[in-house]
Regions:
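Residue-level recognition of single "structural anchor" positions
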Residues: 1-179
Length: 179
């Protein structure tokens, strides 16, 4: 590994840290886009591996929700989830979050993730989606009815995870998605 390659990779890492796109980084540094794109993918993979190694079961007050990622389809009416990526998330109000791409939002799929990633006895907040019906076996289940109010007098809400979805979608939009 040469000193020049190390210097180049550190410059690419700096642009990655600044959240500058791979295309713009390649142009700014006068480096082939393919090289920059591969490095960005390596950085993302390393971050994901690090996060997985640090993972622990979430506990305490947990907000659960699912979200659909993917661009709007021209000609399709409504919000349809067809051809979109489903992401399930668990937000621990103390600060950690777990997300995973899932094939569907069935009870079997979501409850498996909940069982594997949360400690029994936690307090769960959901939007009342039918797949969460058996959540009581893992802890206290509070259902949030957005039709009534966003936050009730007992601070029951899922605003944290919904804010995270908004943040994530804004980030992915900036990069036109992430491979």
């Amino acid at each position: 590994y040469s000193l020049n390659k190390l210097r180049r990779d550190l410059e690419i890492l700096y642009y990655f840290y600044l959240e500058i796109s791979a295309r713009k980084t390649a142009k700014e540094l006068n480096i082939d886009y393919g090289v920059v794109h591969r490095k960005f993918m390596q950085f993302r993979k390393l971050i994901a591996e690090y996060c997985n190694k640090q993972a622990r079961k979430l506990n305490g007050e947990l907000e659960l929700d699912e979200s659909y990622f993917g661009g709007r389809r021209k000609g399709n009416r409504g919000r349809g989830a067809k051809n979109k990526t489903i992401v399930f998330g668990i937000l621990e109000r103390k600060g950690q979050i777990y997300t995973k791409i899932v094939e569907n939002v069935s009870a079997e799929t979501l409850m498996k993730e909940i069982e594997n990633k949360t400690k029994k006895g936690s307090v769960f907040y959901t939007d009342g989606w039918k797949s969460y019906a058996s959540l009581e076996q893992y802890g206290k289940h509070n259902i949030i009815d957005h039709d009534k109010e966003l936050v009730d007098k007992n601070h029951n809400h899922i605003n944290g995870i919904e804010g995270f979805w908004s943040f994530a979608k804004e980030r992915f939009h900036k990069y036109h998605g992430i491979d």
